């Protein structure tokens, strides 16, 4: 590994995404080639037991792009996928994003650099802070998201507002310490990780993003 570069895993948890996965991976590869030149990056598709053509599509792409990797899990759960892949990683930074790339990728380097430069241990995209832009989300879903934010902040006395945006970066050191204490294997994984991080004095930093439903 070239010591002049910071190694980075970009994990994409998926389940039956044959309709969108090829275009999303191609877009992410193109972006990373152009804008992540200071990182030794690889994309890891964490497949939670897809029964469609997702595996075949990713395997085809992995033969085309050396930085695209396929990881199969038979059990479902986004949290399980992330924890398994992050645990097996030896990269300096680890991240994940939703396969639909609903968060504008131009914000990704800002999150990466903030963790790389040690201004925080976990950087997260947020749809609920000032300057964020959310396009196409229904009023009902927006209301539910804000209610959930109010609920966990009130219950756990944490400062971050958006735990569920699929756009996060974590340092190797923080992951090694925190992951053994994270038990949820599904959608609550993100919230649990961030709560435990703040309670153990790891800095979580939110960044406004452009998010399209």
Regions found by a protein language model. Give the residues of each.
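Catalytic donor-sugar/metal-binding loop of nucleotide-sugar-dependent glycosyltransferases
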Residues: 158-159, 183-185, 194-212
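Cell-envelope/extracellular polymer assembly enzymes that use nucleotide-activated donors
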Residues: 7-9, 42, 192
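Acceptor/aglycone-binding surface of glycosyltransferases and processive sugar-polymer synthases
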Residues: 73-88, 93, 105-187, 213
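Conserved donor nucleotide-binding strand/loop of the catalytic core
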Residues: 41-44, 55-88
